[in-house]
Amino acid sequence: MLLAELIGIFIITLSVVYIYYKYVLLNYWRKKGVFYVEPTVPAGNLTSYVTGKLSVGELFRDAYMKYKDHRVFGMYTFFKPNLVIADLDLIRTVLTKEFASFHDRGMFCNEKIDPLSGHLFLLPGKKWRNLRVKLTPTFTSGKIKQMFMILKECGEEFAKNLENKAQMRDCIEIKDIFARYSTDIIMSTAFGIKSNCMKEPNNEFRHWGKKIFEERPFWNALLMFAPQVMDFFSIPFTDRDNVEYRQTHNIVRHDFMNLLIQLMEKGYVEADDEKDVNDESSTVNKLTMLEAAAQAYVFFLAGFETSSTTATYCLYELAQHQDIQDKIRQEIDEMLKQHGKLTYNAVNEMTYLHKVVNETMRKYPPVPVLNRVCTKELDLPTTNIRVTEGTLITIPVFGLHRDPAIYPHPDKFDPERFNADKIAARHPYAYLPFGEGPRICIGTRFGYMQTKIGLVSLLSKYKFKLHPRTPIPLTFDEAPIVLTVKGGVHLIIEPR
């Protein structure tokens, strides 16, 4: 009898929760008169992502393609209303013109329960602004130039380790190889550690890199779209093992990159040859050890996954388009002959390579969606929508980059899209691989250089062809937030 009563109470409670969820929480856009995509309980419009059917980039790409004529439309991420911006002028409004009302990403950040979440990418409001001012001088072209020799050495080691494979005209899996190269680069530039992942693919540095990006779509969805849930239940997004690893090995204390040490000791970064203007009054607000560790952590996250996936996609496309591969190789040869060796200026003068990397990020944007949250209520210009504080905003970058109205024949790999005249003819917010506005990626220069050096190191010595095991087109892994290929990318490598 008691069991029957408990079951009855459970069913009634579940029914009440369902009704409240569906007819109250998921009724927001209908009440506001905004066109919306019909949601389901309990994930809203994220069901296909949290169940592993689509990547988050594909989910919002598909919604954009279907509903872009509405300019803006409503969706639900779990119980939260989410306004998707499909109009380029409105995207500029959110990212730049009305930045004061949309300055936060709305993703999980709680330094008390997860100290390593207190980094530049996630921090809100004033904390973000103060840290951005401190960190901006660490990513000037002058500072990247100072790091160039480290990057070059990693690239040379990278190419050298593939010599035997090339001589045998063997098949290589480039997704893993570029991940190991990226690990070596980040560990060298951020921590002063020679990780040797190219020689030792299963060492502890590669192990922890894999662990950070292990597949967990449900938690990724909470991080991006429902941070309040993680906050309420005190769920740290960063695996505690990663924190313990840093503490046990004293990586931050003894091997931390020099620029962050300056921020800890002085509160500002010393000026380089670009005559950076530093706010020396900030010396009273030096970075703490935990704050510095958080910045090192995001440096690894941002530099590792985005650059390695971009390089992977790029070489995949070049293996299919031998004419483009040959044209890049010709440019590399010309620049090396002109400069005598690989230099910072030589890489920057490789204009065709730059177009190829840009086209790669157009077709495969590393971060396929941009998130913002409304921090100050406002009327969205040229619409009848009043955006209330706390409303999540999503910009479907992957959808924009594959829109045939913006990029004709969007599935075609065509570096000429980034000729100066083509760029000038497009809306400036039609290409967003690094975001835009005040919260544009601070490490854009570093990301470009890391990717280009990896490609130059390989293409100057080797040729690449597609292996029959690699599908055309590629399919995407459903779990990661970054647009990642599913399975391996197998290419045949041979000497020039």
Where are these regions (language model features)?
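Cytochrome P450 heme-thiolate monooxygenase catalytic core
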Residues: 103-115, 146-309, 327
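Cytochrome P450 heme-thiolate "Cys pocket" and heme-binding signature region
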Residues: 137, 297, 302, 421-451, ...
